[in-house]
């Protein structure tokens, strides 16, 4: 747990971009981003457990303003409906779900990339119509 003041000091001292990770289990937890939004470059909303993340209701971050760069984690699977996450966040962290027994699983990675490519193609078609 790093306070906003400590975060500001670290950013100033090292002149690096900062990702602040918040553990989310309720709407009240989401609002903690307000303390960091002017300091951190990215706010990571994650479930409890980090590496062995417990999921949370990802829709809780819907009301976080678009000008806040959001990263979403929390038990997101490689074969989940990615479109629903893309609508509410800038970055999706699903690294752990791409592993089997602690090693990257190329089958899972390929499924994820195919699903992501379908979304990209769909969005390109949609944008070319508008």
Residue ranges and their predicted role:
Residues 28, 49-53, 72-77, 100-104, ...:
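Short C-terminal domain-edge/linker segments immediately following a structured domain
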Residues 10-21, 58-78, 112-118:
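Alpha-helix-loop-beta-strand connector modules within alpha/beta enzyme cores
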Residues 1-11, 16-35, 41-54, 71-74:
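Catalytic beta/alpha-barrel core
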